[in-house]
Amino acid sequence: MFLSRKITKNARTIVQCQRFFQTSIFSQNAAPQSPIKVFMDTFRAELKKSQELQDSVKALQDSSGSLSESDTFKKARDAYEKARSGTTAASSFTGKTVGKAGAKIGSYAQKAWESAPVQLSKKVISSTANTVATGVDTATKPVRETAFYKTIKQTMSDGSTSSRYGFYADKEQRKKLREEFERRNRMFASSARIQPNEDVQSVVVHSNPSWKNKVEQIKNESRLVRKIQELKKSYQESEHPIVSSIRDMADSISGVWSRMFSETEASQVMRRFKEIDPSFNTEHFLQYLREYIVPEVTEAYVKGDKEVLKTWLSEAPFSVYETTTKEYAKHGVVSVGKILDIRGVDIMSQRLLQPNDIPVFIVTFRTQEVHMFKDASSGELVAGKDDRIQQCTYASVFTRVEDELDNPETRGWRIVDFARARAVDYF
């Protein structure tokens, strides 16, 4: 029984496999269709689907039209219109009621504010506040009158008059700022230099300690020391190729070593300025440049003020400027330009000028100027425009003369070179 069932199952499987292979062979042996025929069949099928869709939409529109014309739909629409009109009327009535209530409340509040009790309470509060303020002022008055408080008040700044990014003021304001700056910072050499006492003429010479005398005696009398000195002299003066090569190599190594650990040019410049004025400070000098020196010199340069320029400029740049102004004077014109703004005042580099190793600061800054020239006799404008603003870049070289530290105007600062590097129209 079991064996017969298994045979029947296997027979069915074989029959199914035969049918599958027959179908595959038939489908593979079928004639292929052309692309045009496939396209036409697909087009007809899509057209038929489109026609069926149009018929369905038309039927839906007909049913919608009949629905809108039915009695039930009309009753629902009338009920909606009545409900909306009722809501509008209720909201209008509510708005009017609230407005009337607000007006009444406002009038009551105004009457209450102007009533006698409230006015009395306002007077009491005001007098109490004045009493408290007066008490605080009286209590803090001894503190505010101390020297420490005044010093802190003068030192602190809110940054509104900061000259770090841009600064330009008229001549009177610059002088006031300069006086305040000198008093506050005490940066000038007159406060740090030790004046010589001409009344004292005697000189006290201190003798060397005894151990130094003994060292000098050993150097002069020791044979070993003399031998070492002779060998050193022979090494330095020898012309032997090997000794000369060794000496050159040693000199190059010592040169590299000295360059690695020697002073930079900037540090040498700072040391020289410190030797001239021990109280010198770079930040204070930059502030002094921005607030006084640069505006003073630049304004004189643009307006043609020779007296101010002669005070600050050295002989070479002043001669160049004077030659230029003489050409203007020959044509009977004078400069009446003006400075609008000064920005970017900064020390670009520090240098030692040869051959005397003069320490200098190279300072650059930008200005906004108006250049105009008028006739010296009639005062008529002959060149330039009042609304033509130019942005100019300046380069200047500053040094300090020790013999002029007591000059109340320059404090020893002198401009070695001053030139306008570039000028372009701002507008």
Swiss-Prot record:
PANTHER family from the UniProt entry: MITOCHONDRIAL IMPORT INNER MEMBRANE TRANSLOCASE SUBUNIT TIM44
Pfam family, one: Tim44
Protein family (similarity comment): Belongs to the Tim44 family.
InterPro entries reported in the protein's UniProt record: NTF2-like_dom_sf, Tim44, Tim44-like, Tim44-like_dom
Quaternary state and interactors: Heterodimer with pam18. Component of the PAM complex, at least composed of mtHsp70, mge1, tim44, pam16, pam17 and pam18. The complex interacts with the tim23 component of the PAM complex.
Membrane topology summary: Peripheral membrane protein
Superkingdom of origin: Eukaryota
Keywords linked to the UniProt accession: ATP-binding, Membrane, Mitochondrion, Mitochondrion inner membrane, Nucleotide-binding, Protein transport, Transit peptide, Translocation, Transport
ATP-binding keyword on record: yes
Gene name tied to this protein: tim44
Entry's localization field: Mitochondrion inner membrane
Amino-acid positions noted as binding ATP in the UniProt annotation, renumbered to this chain: A90, S91, S92, F93, T94, G95, K96, T97
Gene3D superfamilies documented for this protein: 3.10.450.240
Stretch forming the signal peptide: none
Gene Ontology CC terms: mitochondrial inner membrane; PAM complex, Tim23 associated import motor
Organism this protein belongs to: Schizosaccharomyces pombe (strain 972 / ATCC 24843) (Fission yeast)
One of the protein's GO biological processes: protein import into mitochondrial matrix
Record-linked NCBIfam families: 3a0801s03tim44
Name listed for the protein in its UniProt record: Mitochondrial import inner membrane translocase subunit tim44
Primary location recorded for the protein, binned into one broad class: mitochondrion
Function: Essential component of the PAM complex, a complex required for the translocation of transit peptide-containing proteins from the inner membrane into the mitochondrial matrix in an ATP-dependent manner. Recruits mitochondrial HSP70 and its co-chaperone (mge1) to drive protein translocation into the matrix using ATP as an energy source.
One of the record's GO molecular function terms: ATP binding
